Amino acid sequence: MSDKQPLVDGEFGARIERRRFILVGAAFVGLAGCHTLRVPPPERGCDFLARFSAQHNLGGVPRCWRPQIMRHDRPTTHYEVAERDGRTVLHSVSDGATSGLRCDVDMDPNDTPWLHWTWRVDSVDLRATVAFDELDDSPTRVIVAFDGDNSLLTPRDRLFHEMVEMVTGYAAPFATLMYVWDGRAPTESIFQYPRTSRIRYLVVESGAANTGRWLSYSRNVVEDYRRVFGGEPGRIRAVAVLTDSDDLKTHSEAWYGDIAFSNSLD
């Protein structure tokens, strides 16, 4: 029996049998601030979620966002501030590549539980799905890392956290939630990383029906956390984006609008 633990019922959930160690484990480590990322320390005054629309350096990495290297043996996704449809956004291009971009923050999700973002994808590989390691590509992911009480970790999860800290020198987030665009998994599906229960995925877009236009999302991260993990969320320590196509070796391109938290749905 596979130790992968799908949290979705039905035929699609029953087919989830393969592990996805490298990509997701690296994302987990990356959000923990892994020293192997070889990136500069955070800029001063960057303890907030910087908006892409406020950036002035077209063609460069947005201020307060840092590269999140997923695998040193594969190409990295290219991220830059760009203009698209009359707005200043983050443009991502992956040609068989994988890497993310993250912004370190310190926020209480109970004060501002609503996470808002927009993204645009013009094409989706319908083979790609976070359910299988050999197909684990996604044109867009928005990732949130949470603090928490490590004394509540199961022995298995504690061992995983200790391994991450031993390898990286940094403490892993207590919980990592990824909002993903999947090629075929149903929306609102939830998946759990097999090696720890503290990394989970929530599918917010699926298939190609909504490609070619800007899509807007508003998610209550407190409610999503309760649904996905159970319990109450701790402080938010990082937000990241990820466009990758390293498993299927395809071209993937996306545009991310501002990512912001607020205390209301509107």
Task: Annotate each predicted stretch with a short phrase.
Residues 1-17, 24-32:
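N-terminal secretory signal peptides
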Residues 92-111, 124-127, 196-204:
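Secreted extracellular polysaccharide-interacting domains
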Residues 77-99:
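Short carbohydrate-recognition loop motifs
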Residues 139-142, 197-207, 211-249:
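Extracellular beta-strand ligand-recognition surfaces/modules
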Residues 254-264:
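Exposed low-complexity, polar/acidic, P/S/T/G-rich flexible segments that act as propeptides
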Residues 52, 239, 259-261:
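Extracellular beta-strand elements of beta-rich domains used
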